Amino acid sequence: MGKLESSPDVYRFSEHYLPWHAHITAVTVAPEARRLGIGRLLTEQLEVAADAGDAWFVDLFVRVTNHKAITFYKNMGYSVFRVVKDYYGEHSTDPSQSSEDAYDMRKPMKRDVKREHVREDGEKHEVDPSDVW
């Protein structure tokens, strides 16, 4: 599941402003249907829609421990843009629960000729969940 979106214009001058882009909300393939190219096909279709909609990039969030997904997306041209500390977990409602960081991964689309919305050293850029909206 994915969508095209941007941050509200009122935040245009914020360092966390997100211009027009596509966002992968979830890609889920049944275990018995994995490794058949279905996830790649679904992701590529969102990328086609992103280019057709003149988006700057496609982004997604993935747990830093989900090595299979990270490898999958890197093989498709995505890179880590930033690390979102404590993105996953029940720590906000139950402090006794542990949390987990997320990678915000991005792939530039045709519009981003200068690659302004991706970076090579994203693992070094950490933000809090409150910086991601």
Q: What name fits each language-model region?
A:
Residues 1-34, 40-54, 83, 106-116, ...:
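Acetyl-CoA-dependent GNAT
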Residues 28, 64-66:
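Active-site-proximal loop/turn and secondary-structure-junction residues that shape catalytic pockets
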Residues 59-61, 74, 79-104:
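Conserved catalytic-core motifs of GNAT/GCN5-like acyltransferases
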Residues 43, 66-69, 85-92:
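Short glycine/proline-centered loop/turn elements that form peptide/ligand docking sites
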Residues 35, 69-70:
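Internal amphipathic alpha-helical segments of the cytochrome P450 catalytic fold
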Residues 50-62, 72:
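Conserved GNAT acetyl-CoA-binding A-motif
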Residues 97-101, 112, 121:
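Charge-rich, low-complexity terminal tails
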